[in-house]
């Protein structure tokens, strides 16, 4: 029974991340510039991206930050 509960929680978590990713947009032509406060946080967090295109390109973000959008650097990123 407890494994079933853990399984259900995991399914809900995956669904939440998926729906969060669908709310964003991919910026190809005109990448959205992050506000200066977020840029500073990105640089200090080893992800020196200044816009969403840099972050999504993998130059600064990783799978875990850009695709799951846990990091402020990937705030506007979406998986391609």
From Swiss-Prot:
Subcellular location: Secreted
Pfam families in the cross-refs: Toxin_21
Any single GO CC term annotated in Swiss-Prot or TrEMBL for this entry: extracellular region
Propeptide residues per the UniProt entry: 21-41
Keywords for this protein: Cleavage on pair of basic residues, Disulfide bond, Knottin, Secreted, Signal, Toxin
Cysteines engaged in disulfide bonds, as pairs: 42-56, 49-60, 55-77, 66-73
Cleavable signal peptide: 1-20
Main function: Causes paralysis to insect larvae (H.virescens). This toxin is active only on insects.
Protein name per the record: U1-nemetoxin-Csp1a
Native species: Calisoga sp. (Spider)
């Amino acid at each position: 029974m407890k494994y079933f509960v853990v399984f259900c929680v995991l399914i809900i978590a995956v669904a939440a991340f998926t729906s969060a990713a669908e709310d964003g947009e991919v910026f190809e032509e005109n990448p959205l510039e992050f506000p200066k406060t977020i840029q500073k946080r990105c640089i200090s967090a080893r992800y020196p991206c200044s816009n969403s295109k840099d972050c999504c390109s993998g130059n600064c973000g990783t799978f875990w930050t850009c695709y799951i959008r846990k990091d402020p650097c990937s705030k506007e990123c979406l998986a391609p």
